[in-house]
A protein has these predicted regions:
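Short amphipathic alpha-helical interface segments
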Residues: 2-34
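Non-catalytic, well-ordered alpha-helical scaffold segments
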Residues: 5-9, 45, 71, 75-78
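Generic structural signal for hydrophobic core residues of well-folded globular domains
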Residues: 15-18, 51, 81-84
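N-terminal intrinsically disordered, cationic/polar leader segments
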Residues: 29-32, 50, 111
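Short amphipathic alpha-helical interaction segments
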Residues: 37-54, 68
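A short, conserved structural fragment
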Residues: 52-63
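Short, amphipathic alpha-helical interaction segments positioned at domain boundaries
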Residues: 69-97
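Exposed, interaction-prone assembly regions rather than primary DNA-binding/catalytic cores
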Residues: 86-125
Length: 125
């Protein structure tokens, strides 16, 4: 399956909105999270796995029926989401990724970090 950066972002936003101290997020076949409705169950589960492998989320408990329980975003996940939360920053990040011809999560995280760094630098000029 191809990595869909928009799906990753929507998953991270959904996890942030639905977790907290002592509160995990359950993702099941019939889940009704607004941002995830446009993706198939398999697509979301694949991208949850990619988020876990990339250390963006913590403690994913997987069950035999394909559902899972997610504890929270990791510190790295919070940082990445902070960098891409703004639609403007996200669209710029995706545009640069497309221009350079990459869709890897590592590259997208690096591009997002640089987009933010350039915005900060511009404030000092």
């Amino acid at each position: 399956m191809k990595l869909n950066p928009d799906c990753i972002r929507d998953i991270l936003i959904t996890i942030e909105d639905n977790t907290g101290f002592g509160k995990s997020m359950s993702y099941e076949l019939n889940s009704t999270y607004d941002l995830l409705q446009k993706y198939t169950f398999d697509e979301v589960r694949y991208h949850i796995d990619q988020c876990e492998l990339s250390n963006l989320i913590t403690k994913v408990h997987k069950f035999m029926d394909g559902s899972c329980l997610i504890q929270d975003l990791s510190p790295s996940g919070h940082q990445f989401l902070a960098d891409i939360r703004s639609d403007n920053n996200w669209n710029k990040t995706k545009s640069i990724a497309k221009t350079v011809g990459t869709s890897s999560l590592t590259a997208i995280k690096e591009i997002a970090t640089n987009v933010i760094a350039e915005l900060i630098k511009a404030q000092f000029q």
